[in-house]
Swiss-Prot record:
Role noted for this protein: Covalently attaches a chromophore to Cys residue(s) of phycobiliproteins.
Keywords: Lyase
PANTHER family (alphabetical): CHROMOPHORE LYASE CRL, CHLOROPLASTIC (PTHR35137:SF1)
Tree of life domain: Bacteria
Similarity comment: Belongs to the CpcT/CpeT biliprotein lyase family.
GO MF annotations, alphabetized: lyase activity
InterPro entries found in the cross-reference section: CpcT/CpeT, CpcT/CpeT_sf
Pfam families for the chain: CpeT
Protein name, as recorded: Chromophore lyase CpcT/CpeT 2
Enzyme Commission numbers on file: 4.-.-.-
Length: 200
């Protein structure tokens, strides 16, 4: 793994909250906690992160579990591959429960080939970077779970201390946004650092 990929993983591995944003604009942004927890999968060439979030007032009801695989693209750049869990309920709560995390295996996952993000790297200062993950042009992230087809628009920006997420759900028929970052990104600050859990 390259130093660039490892830095990308270190920036993302953590527990994040958008407390300031939610206090400033409570009508538009729910106060969320987001977990990005390292997993010992794809270790030969990638960093795997379990992603999950919850409203602060319902931390015992996390939702949107998914797996991010940070790796290199065929062209040599960085990319983020998204995986869906075959049984969402079986992994619910893994963001704050390492016992559930440890039980996750490759057999629990389905790769979503239309949901891969290309990553651009900007140098901000000495040893300080910004990673911007965006979908490929004309790419539609669609998948089916329990007979229902979903479409989402994905994307994020991360630095050593902050994370902006652009994820939003779309109506597959009209393409209109129905949930998520409809008025701009969710703006998170890192509250806990999980980079020590990375196997690099």
């Amino acid at each position: 793994m390259t130093p660039e990929l490892i830095t990308f993983g270190r920036y993302l591995a953590g527990e994040f909250e958008n407390q300031r944003q939610a206090q400033a604009e409570p009508v538009w942004y729910v106060h969320l906690r987001l977990w990005l927890r390292p997993l010992p999968l794809f270790r030969e060439d990638s960093i795997a992160l379990f992603a999950e979030q919850a409203s602060i007032i319902n931390l015992d009801q996390p939702y949107r579990p998914r797996l991010w695989r940070l790796t290199h693209s065929e062209s040599g750049g960085l990319e983020v591959r998204h995986y869906m869990f075959n049984d969402l309920k079986s992994v619910q709560g893994a963001g704050k429960n390492p016992d559930i995390l440890r039980k996750i295996s490759l057999e629990d996952l389905t790769f979503l080939p239309t949901c891969t993000l290309a990553v651009k790297v900007n140098t901000l200062a000495d040893n300080q970077y910004q990673f911007i993950a965006q979908p490929q042009p004309e790419q539609r992230c669609q998948f089916t779970y329990e007979g229902t087809t979903y479409q989402v628009a994905l994307g994020f920006e991360v630095t050593s201390h902050s994370l902006k997420t652009y994820d939003k759900g779309l109506d597959p028929g009209t393409g209109k946004g129905i949930w998520g970052a409809l008025l701009g990104p969710y703006q998170y600050e890192k509250k806990r650092d999980f980079s020590a859990e990375l196997d690099v």
